[in-house]
Amino acid sequence: MAQTVPPCELPCKEYDVARNTGAYTSSGLATASFRTSKYLLEEWFQNCYARYHQAFADRDQSERQRHESQQLATETQALAQRTQQDSTRTVGERLQDTHSWKSELQREMEALAAETNLLLAQKQRLERALDATEVPFSITTDNLQCRERREHPNLVRDHVETELLKEAELIRNIQELLKRTIMQAVSQIRLNREHKETCEMDWSDKMEAYNIDETCGRHHSQSTEVQAHPYSTTFQESASTPETRAKFTQDNLCRAQRERLASANLRVLVDCILRDTSEDLRLQCDAVNLAFGRRCEELEDARYKLHHHLHKTLREITDQEHNVAALKQAIKDKEAPLHVAQTRLYLRSHRPNMELCRDAAQFRLLSEVEELNMSLTALREKLLEAEQSLRNLEDIHMSLEKDIAAMTNSLFIDRQKCMAHRTRYPTILQLAGYQ
């Protein structure tokens, strides 16, 4: 507050003025007709005295006002300088505060950009891993389709098919998991970029405010670019307070840091998912390959046994054919003695009169015929049995050959088709998205 000189009353001054009261005065010569329109001499003196006094008072008041004005100008000049210096210092402090916030925002933006790039790399790994699962899935489905072409009785739901179905289900589940994780990564990348953009806008505002305050800090009373802005002192309704301004930036930083932490956690999760899924796929691939190997060993062993039985069956067929031929020859050999005995009986039936006797020779011939018939019956039954056995052997021979052919076909499918195709299975690095 400027100090002023307090007002005070002027001292009374006496003035020595010569009065016109001599012998030749005209004070008494006034006529009655002019008396009313003229002043008295005393009035004239009083008027002069009043003018003198008024002039002195005005000069004295002017001197006091000049003194007060000079003093006020000096004080206001000093006050203006102090105020300007204080404002410059305050603007400088604000510059430091703005620079501090700007630096924190800059660091957070750089950290968020780096984190986003790392998450983008993880997303690309997920996409490569998802693409890599297409090869195992096509291999598995091709194996299942190829094994559908196995012939009876080898078209069975064996351990290999069970493992292949488990592998197909595992691949489908992993593909769904990778797709969900990719969508989660895309969403997190979008959030990272949104918060980075928010920090960039805040940083840009602070950069502009910093430049403005820096320009303000360089202004002084001798600056030529300053102008009068009478309405600049009006507060804007949208103006923030230091507390709300700091809270706004702090909230932006906290949200950005929170998303950056969530992004880092997601990257760790992606690493775990890719490691686990690639290991699970390779373990299941090894399980399928092991099942194929065991199944091929079983087929090889079964085919070897079938070949062994086929060899024995062929030998038995040969022996049985010889047996059938021998039985036929034996039957043929029994026909001549039977015909002899029957001829003898026939001829002896023509003996005359008492010579037609049932003698020992007759009974022996009858028993011979009966024995020969029984032998022929037994031989014919045995021949039928031998022929049926031969037919059975021929049937089993055909069945064995069909089974061997089916086993050979199954071995070809499992070994030459399926296992050869499975050599194209991706490596663990490809399944983990590194290649």
UniProtKB/Swiss-Prot annotation:
Keywords: Cell projection, Cilium, Cilium biogenesis/degradation, Coiled coil, Cytoplasm, Cytoskeleton, Flagellum, Ubl conjugation. It holds the Pfam family Tektin. It is found in: Cytoplasm, Cytoskeleton, Cilium axoneme; Cytoplasm, Cytoskeleton, Flagellum axoneme. One of its GO terms (cellular component) is microtubule cytoskeleton. Residues 102-180, 310-336, 363-411 form a coiled coil. Strongly expressed in spermatozoa. Also detected at low levels in pancreas. Expressed in airway epithelial cells. Residues 60-96 are annotated as: Disordered. GO terms for biological process: cilium assembly; cilium movement involved in cell motility; flagellated sperm motility. Residues 70-85 have a biased composition (Low complexity). InterPro entries: Tektin-like, Tektins. Residues 60-69 have a biased composition (Basic and acidic residues). Disulfide bonds: none annotated. Its main location: cytoplasm. Ubiquitinated, leading to its degradation. Deubiquitinated by USP16, promoting its stability. Microtubule inner protein component of sperm flagellar doublet microtubules. Microtubule inner protein (MIP) part of the dynein-decorated doublet microtubules (DMTs) in cilia and flagellar axoneme. Forms filamentous polymers in the walls of ciliary and flagellar microtubules. Contributes to normal sperm motility. Belongs to the tektin family. This is Tektin-4. It comes from Homo sapiens (Human). The lineage of its organism: Eukaryota, Metazoa, Chordata, Craniata, Vertebrata.
